[in-house]
């Protein structure tokens, strides 16, 4: 494949934007390949400005659960935009999407719409602290909850130590109110609560970690979080920005049967437009302004375009949708294991609904430390060879791949064949 136009576009972009991009992963640095500039998408396919076609497993990093340019979503967006883009006042569309979210998400009795997943997690932590009167938050290593200061935190030097800034610009005073423990490790969480329990406002977790590859919870982990937070009077917060409506019809909490106090949403609920949301029990949500004293606001929160795209996306999802995802996922997982075994290359495949992650190691992979043992050099080679075969994968080992309703068995079979061809070139 040729990337002449993308390379030229990137040279211009680098003079205009830091690194030439508006989000770091789009620079493709970890796979040592030129950034690709996209032109359009249709169904399960995406097309770059050089005219190359790919089967798309990035799907705008998760939101496009119906694939690109779904006819129903696009048609209703045209109708909405003809009425205006934003009004600074409420619309009936907000009621429609809010009701649908409340009906499907077990933990949500009331919901507040925002404009991004980062806003959702940031506002949820403020709400948790305001509601409990406590300061500290527990997060898990490898889980990403957006780029707010209190969540860009890495672990300290030992189990359940106070956090350290993970980015320049994050004050130590903020970092010290974030406790980081290993994912899937209830013993570490218990130690954290034994040391700081009286001042822990909440525990925030991706119920399926999707930002260190895809790592599902081990059996009993989520229920353990529920039990421990309840015991200490802290709030359990599920960050379902990625897993929401991807893992199951009732989100990850419905799939695993564990109900948090608060839930953060994003990605799928906007159908490709900027959106986020957070919700939970009425008694907690009613502490937010204008009913309560905990402040939250947003100029474009609940804007009619995002509400339209979100509603028309979610309204097309049904329990049968997830049966289809499981069928495609089974074929892809079996094919990956078969092809990698054929070439004597170790692989660990993790799945949850329409989220799939593969690690180039023996496994198992249940936490960030194990994820880091994946062969990153081989992953980069694999990415480059798969792009040549017309398959667009996330350009990072630590991002998940996604399926959409637009993907077909033929797409999956072509992808498996592409892996076989790529490995044939890589493994001598």
From Swiss-Prot:
- Which cellular component, as a GO term, is one annotated location? cytoplasm
**Source domain of life:** Bacteria
Q: Name one GO biological process term.
A: protoporphyrinogen IX biosynthetic process
The answer, when asked if Ubl conjugation is one of the entry's keywords, is: no
* Pathway the protein acts in: Porphyrin-containing compound metabolism; protoporphyrin-IX biosynthesis; 5-aminolevulinate from L-glutamyl-tRNA(Glu): step 2/2
Output the SUPFAM superfamilies linked to this UniProt entry: PLP-dependent transferases
Identify the coding gene.
Answer: hemL1
Keywords, ordered alphabetically: Cytoplasm, Isomerase, Porphyrin biosynthesis, Pyridoxal phosphate
Self-association and partners:
Homodimer.
Residues that the record marks as modified (N6-(pyridoxal phosphate)lysine) are 267
Main subcellular location of this protein, as a coarse class:
cytoplasm
Cofactor requirement? pyridoxal 5'-phosphate
**Family the entry assigns:** Belongs to the class-III pyridoxal-phosphate-dependent aminotransferase family. HemL subfamily.
Q: Which reaction does it catalyse?
A: (S)-4-amino-5-oxopentanoate = 5-aminolevulinate
> Mind telling me what this protein is named?
Glutamate-1-semialdehyde 2,1-aminomutase 1
Q: Which PANTHER family match?
A: GLUTAMATE-1-SEMIALDEHYDE 2,1-AMINOMUTASE, GLUTAMATE-1-SEMIALDEHYDE 2,1-AMINOMUTASE 1, CHLOROPLASTIC-RELATED
- Which Enzyme Commission number(s) are listed? 5.4.3.8
Q: Which PROSITE patterns match?
A: AA_TRANSFER_CLASS_3
């Amino acid at each position: 494949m040729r990337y002449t136009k993308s390379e030229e576009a990137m040279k211009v972009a680098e003079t205009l934007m830091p690194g030439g991009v508006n989000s770091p992963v789009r620079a493709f640095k970890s796979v040592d390949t030129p950034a690709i500039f996209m032109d359009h998408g249709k169904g399960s396919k995406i097309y770059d400005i050089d005219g190359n076609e790919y089967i798309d497993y990035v799907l705008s990093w998760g939101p496009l659960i119906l694939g690109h340019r779904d006819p129903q979503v696009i048609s209703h967006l045209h109708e909405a935009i003809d009425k205006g883009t934003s009004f600074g006042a409420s619309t009936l569309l907000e009621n429609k999407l809010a009701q649908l979210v409340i009906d499907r998400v077990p933990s949500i009795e009331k919901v507040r719409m925002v404009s991004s997943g980062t806003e959702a997690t940031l506002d949820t932590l403020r709400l948790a602290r305001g509601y409990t009167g406590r300061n500290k938050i527990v997060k898990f290593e490898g889980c990403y909850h957006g780029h707010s200061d209190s969540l860009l935190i890495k672990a300290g030097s030992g189990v359940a130590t106070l956090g350290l800034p993970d980015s320049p610009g994050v004050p130590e005073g903020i970092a010290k109110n974030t406790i980081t423990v290993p994912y899937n490790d209830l013993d570490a969480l218990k130690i954290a609560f034994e040391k700081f329990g009286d001042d822990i406002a909440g525990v925030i977790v991706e119920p399926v970690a999707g930002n260190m590859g895809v790592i599902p919870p081990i059996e009993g982990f989520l229920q353990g979080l529920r039990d421990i937070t309840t015991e200490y009077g802290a709030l359990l917060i599920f960050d379902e920005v990625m897993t929401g409506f991807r893992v199951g019809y009732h989100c990850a909490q419905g799939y695993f049967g564990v109900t948090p106090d608060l839930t953060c949403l994003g990605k799928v609920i906007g159908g490709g437009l900027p959106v986020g949301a957070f919700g939970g029990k009425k008694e907690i949500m009613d502490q937010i302004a204008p009913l309560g004293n905990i402040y939250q606001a947003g100029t474009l929160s609940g804007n009619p375009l995002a509400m339209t795209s979100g509603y028309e996306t979610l309204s097309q999802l049904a329990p049968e949708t997830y049966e289809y995802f499981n069928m495609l996922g089974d074929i892809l997982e079996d094919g990956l294991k078969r092809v990698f075994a054929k070439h004597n290359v170790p692989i660990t495949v993790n799945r949850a609904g329409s989220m799939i992650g593969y690690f180039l190691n023996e496994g198992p992979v249940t936490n960030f430390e194990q994820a880091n043992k994946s062969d990153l050099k081989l992953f980069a080679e694999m990415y480059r060879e798969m792009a040549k075969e017309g398959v667009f994968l996330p350009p990072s080992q630590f991002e998940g791949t996604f399926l959409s309703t637009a993907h077909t068995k033929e797409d999956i079979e072509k992808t498996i064949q592409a892996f076989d061809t790529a490995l044939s070139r890589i493994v001598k």
